[in-house]
Design a protein with these regions (language model features):
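Gly/Ser-rich "nucleophile elbow"/oxyanion-hole loop immediately N-terminal to the catalytic nucleophile
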Residues: 1-9
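Gly/Ala-rich beta-loop-alpha elbow adjacent to hydrolase catalytic centers
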Residues: 8-12, 16
Length: 351
């Protein structure tokens, strides 16, 4: 048997990874995990095959959206060569992918159920993406958006937010919290966006239920604040700059407004070129919600934003950075034109 792709929903969304790893003779070509439930740790290595993970915003069953944790495990495998996609489906819920589950999520609250998209619309999204996933994996051995320059914020008439991982050159990473940087009119600090008491990221809320997730939090209170990352990189053989980031919608500095970011490269001769990520870029949008206070102990509350704020991947064609020597890049700079704001930065790569 050849051309094998496994698709699993909920607990089966986790189990397909185990099947592919434990039965190598099956020759699995790709994995599509739908609202996967990470009920126990994986028993071995995760398969190095094209993988897509769908997580619905209003999942009352897998309320921590465990698929984000699986994506992170795949992304941080240094030996991995296959592409990976994480798609956050706004307005989706756990049951909406399947006709076998006709009732709303039994653990979802009334407000979430009211905001959930019609099940027919969610299944149409799932059907279209599944077809495209199968075609892309079998014909190109990659996930559908692996080499797409401008990642969409709409798919099958549904709003989405996407992270995509492909083999790439790391230029900055928040993992380990030890990268060099300088700031001007901005404050930067390393935070742990954890779902536990070890959280240091305030009310910022990632999907995934992480115990540890390193981010660089950048905050500013006046326009044209900057943060710079020194590097020594030859980018002439790459086509795109890729940034994983998110607006911290829980921070009142953002004023419930979308943000914009100017991305600047500087070469060894001091030449600079800039590209603007405009307000409305999916990863820089304000996500509607409010800060919730969860009572803990000794009078302290755990702060949590009512809406998940996933990271999004932004890609910029390197050819858009004109008049710099891409073979001798020495600095990456982010400039924030707005009067005030706050973002979370995970990584900057070239591929």
């Amino acid at each position: 048997m050849d051309q094998v792709i496994l698709i699993g929903h909920s607990r089966a969304g986790r189990d397909i990874f185990e099947v592919a790893e434990r039965l190598p003779d099956l020759g699995v070509d790709g994995l599509l995990a739908v609202a996967p439930a990470l009920i126990s740790p994986f028993s071995g290595e995760l398969p190095d095959v094209p993988t897509s993970i769908l997580i619905p915003q209003y999942d009352g069953d897998v309320s921590t959206l465990d698929g984000a944790k699986i994506y992170d495990d795949l992304e941080n495998d240094p030996e991995r060569t296959a592409s990976t996609e994480l798609i956050y489906l706004k307005g989706g819920n756990h049951a909406g992918f399947s006709t076998a589950l006709v009732r709303p999520d039994p653990f979802a609250d009334a407000e979430s159920i009211a905001a959930t998209m019609p099940a027919e619309k969610q299944r149409a999204f799932f059907s279209q993406y599944t077809k495209e996933f199968l075609q892309s994996v079998l014909e190109k051995q990659q996930t559908p958006f692996a080499d797409t320059q401008e990642l969409p914020d709409q798919y099958a008439d549904c709003e989405i937010l996407m992270q995509v991982d492909v083999p790439a050159k790391d230029l900055f990473s928040a993992v380990g919290a030890d990268a060099q940087l300088t700031t001007e009119k901005a404050a930067a600090d390393w935070v742990n966006a954890s779902s536990t008491v070890d959280n240091t990221a305030g009310a910022f809320r990632l999907p995934g239920g992480f115990t540890t997730y390193d981010l660089l939090r950048i905050r500013w209170d006046e326009p044209d604040a900057e943060i710079s990352f020194p590097c020594s990189a030859d980018l002439s053989g790459y086509t795109n700059l890729q940034i994983d980031l998110a607006q911290d919608s829980s921070d009142e500095r953002n004023g419930q407004q979308d943000q914009q970011v100017v991305v600047m490269l500087q070469d060894a001769r001091g030449n600079r070129a800039a590209v603007t990520l405009p307000a409305g870029t999916p990863a820089l949008r304000w996500q509607q919600g409010e800060i919730e206070r969860i009572p803990m102990w000794e009078g302290e509350d755990f702060l949590q934003y009512s809406t998940f704020t996933p990271l999004g991947t932004v890609r910029i064609p390197l050819e858009d950075f004109q008049d710099v020597d891409l073979s001798a890049i020495r600095e990456i700079r982010l400039v924030f034109p707005s009067d005030a704001g706050s973002i979370m930065l995970r990584e900057i790569q070239a591929f």
